[in-house]
């Protein structure tokens, strides 16, 4: 883990490309200028960072950070923390020591998730989708996707599908 150091990193997002791996925000994009928390991932084929909004960091992650880095010198052990403002450094150290992020940061992540849910709601259709298939005898089968049996299938005469040209 030569690139990852401790395996954890906190920084200000330089761009809007990363998506949050947390579920609290609905996996929304991490906007440029916001604080993000990364976990180093080494899959064998590639190495990368899995990013989360600071408000999406779970108590279990904070416990693992505390166990790996120790309580004594979090500021010197956590990658990227020294580039943050003193206010954010205090916030991060307090969260690691307490075992959870502050309520206000969690609220911000929940707001992102609510915005995403409102924007991504789809209109409900009145009828379920249908699948149309042709079998070997050129019969057209129309069947509801939701039905489990062929009892709902409708058969038509195959002669109308193939007329002389």
Swiss-Prot record:
PROSITE patterns in the cross-refs: ZF_PARP_2
Comp. bias (Basic residues): 131-141
Coiled coil segments of this chain: none
Main location: cytoplasm
UniProt biased composition (Polar residues): 117-128
Alphabetized InterPro entries for the sequence: Znf_PARP (IPR001510), Znf_PARP_sf (IPR036957)
Compositionally biased spans, kind Acidic residues: 149-165
Alphabetic keyword roster: Cytoplasm, DNA-binding, Metal-binding, Nucleus, Zinc, Zinc-finger
Cellular compartment(s): Cytoplasm; Nucleus
GO cellular component term, pick one: cytosol
Biased composition (Basic and acidic residues): 100-114
Pfam family, one: zf-PARP
Zinc finger (PARP-type) in chain: 8-100
Region (Disordered): 100-165
One GO MF term: DNA binding
Protein name: PARP-type zinc finger-containing protein C13F5.07c
Source taxonomy: Eukaryota, Fungi, Dikarya, Ascomycota, Taphrinomycotina
């Amino acid at each position: 883990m030569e690139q990852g150091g401790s395996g954890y990193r906190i920084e200000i997002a330089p761009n809007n490309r990363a998506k949050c791996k947390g579920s609290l925000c609905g996996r929304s994009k991490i906007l440029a200028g916001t604080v993000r928390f990364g976990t180093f991932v080494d899959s064998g084929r590639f190495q990368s960072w899995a990013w989360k909004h600071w408000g999406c960091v779970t108590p279990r992650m904070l416990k693992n950070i505390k166990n790996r880095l120790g309580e004594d010198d979090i500021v010197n052990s956590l990658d990227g923390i020294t580039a943050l403002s003193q206010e954010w450094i205090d916030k991060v150290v307090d969260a690691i020591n307490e075992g959870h992020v502050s309520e206000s940061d969690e609220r911000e992540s929940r707001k992102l998730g609510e915005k995403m849910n409102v924007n991504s709601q789809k209109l409900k259709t009145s009828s379920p989708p249908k699948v149309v298939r042709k079998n070997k005898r050129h019969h057209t089968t129309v069947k509801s996707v939701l039905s489990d049996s062929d009892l709902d299938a409708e058969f038509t005469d195959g002669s109308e599908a193939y007329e002389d040209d």
